[in-house]
């Protein structure tokens, strides 16, 4: 018989840097999950992407056990990484902070594809382009 699910926890944690401090500790603590066990498992699974913000969905069961699924980093993080910038523009329609080529957009879209609600790579590329435009990045 399947285990009874008592809750889901969604967090964005830097890859390889999970620790019991807030926000992870309190979120897991209120569900009775072993915090150190999660931190060790998460850090082991994400050590290749060290430092990149990684969304994670933790499923907590009635017996206080858990499973977790890591997602791909947010599109904005991937765009900033591709351009080597700290943050997007505060006035995106006036100040442009960089230029993204179609090839870079395609690479980011193919990386994000499993987590995007897009039927094709072209649709995923349009989603990424929209995110880039809202950050003040020009598509060339």
Swiss-Prot record:
Entry's Gene Ontology cellular component terms: cytosolic large ribosomal subunit
Gene3D superfamilies associated with the record: Ribosomal protein L11, C-terminal domain, Ribosomal protein L11/L12, N-terminal domain
One Pfam family linked to the record: Ribosomal_L11_N
Listed InterPro entries: Ribosomal_uL11 (IPR000911), Ribosomal_uL11_bac-typ (IPR006519), Ribosomal_uL11_C (IPR020783), Ribosomal_uL11_C_sf (IPR036769), Ribosomal_uL11_N (IPR020784), Ribosomal_uL11_N_sf (IPR036796)
Example GO molecular function: structural constituent of ribosome
UniProt keyword list: Methylation, Ribonucleoprotein, Ribosomal protein, RNA-binding, rRNA-binding
SUPFAM superfamilies: Ribosomal L11/L12e N-terminal domain, Ribosomal protein L11, C-terminal domain
One GO-annotated biological process of the protein: translation
Posttranslational mods: One or more lysine residues are methylated.
HAMAP family tied to this protein: Ribosomal_uL11
PANTHER family: 60S RIBOSOMAL PROTEIN L12, LARGE RIBOSOMAL SUBUNIT PROTEIN UL11M
Job description of the protein: Forms part of the ribosomal stalk which helps the ribosome interact with GTP-bound translation factors.
Family: Belongs to the universal ribosomal protein uL11 family.
Listed NCBIfam families: L11_bact
Quaternary context: Part of the ribosomal stalk of the 50S ribosomal subunit. Interacts with L10 and the large rRNA to form the base of the stalk. L10 forms an elongated spine to which L12 dimers bind in a sequential fashion forming a multimeric L10(L12)X complex.
Name of this protein: Large ribosomal subunit protein uL11
Originating species: Geotalea daltonii (strain DSM 22248 / JCM 15807 / FRC-32)
């Amino acid at each position: 018989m399947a285990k009874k699910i008592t809750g889901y926890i969604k967090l964005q944690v830097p890859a390889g840097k999970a620790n019991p401090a807030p926000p992870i500790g309190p979120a897991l603590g209120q569900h009775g999950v072993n915090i150190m066990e999660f931190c060790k498992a998460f850090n082991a699974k994400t050590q290749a992407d060290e430092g990149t913000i990684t969304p994670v969905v933790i499923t907590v069961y009635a017996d206080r056990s858990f499973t977790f699924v890591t997602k791909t980093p947010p599109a904005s993080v991937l765009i900033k990484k591709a351009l080597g910038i700290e943050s997007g523009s505060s006035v995106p329609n006036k100040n442009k902070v960089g230029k993204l080529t179609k090839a870079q957009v395609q690479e980011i879209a193919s990386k994000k594809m499993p987590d995007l609600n897009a039927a094709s790579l072209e649709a995923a590329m349009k989603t990424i382009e929209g995110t880039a435009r809202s950050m003040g990045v020009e598509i060339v």
